[in-house]
Regions:
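Short, surface-exposed, polar/charged, turn-prone segments marking secondary-structure boundaries
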Residues: 36-38, 65-66
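Short, well-ordered alpha-helical segments
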Residues: 2-37
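A cross-kingdom feature marking charged/low-complexity
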Residues: 44-66
Length: 66
């Protein structure tokens, strides 16, 4: 039987929500092994004038505990 754990990560990017999600996984993988899935819980962005300047994600990362 596998035991799974979920952590919540906030990340941002100046390119896209997808890039912010990739950054969250990359950063988490520095200390967490056996990542199985990512659930994008929330997306938001900041705006400067008439332009989006930061894409933000709140993700839940699931990994297997050995």
């Amino acid at each position: 039987m596998a035991v799974l754990k979920v952590i919540e990560i906030l990340a941002n990017s100046d390119k896209s929500w997808e890039d912010a999600t990739r950054k969250a996984v990359k950063h988490a993988s520095k200390t967490v092994k056996n990542i199985k899935s990512v659930y994008v819980n929330e997306q938001s962005c900041t705006v400067n004038g008439d332009d989006v300047n930061q894409f933000r994600v709140n993700v839940k990362i699931t990994f297997e505990v050995s």
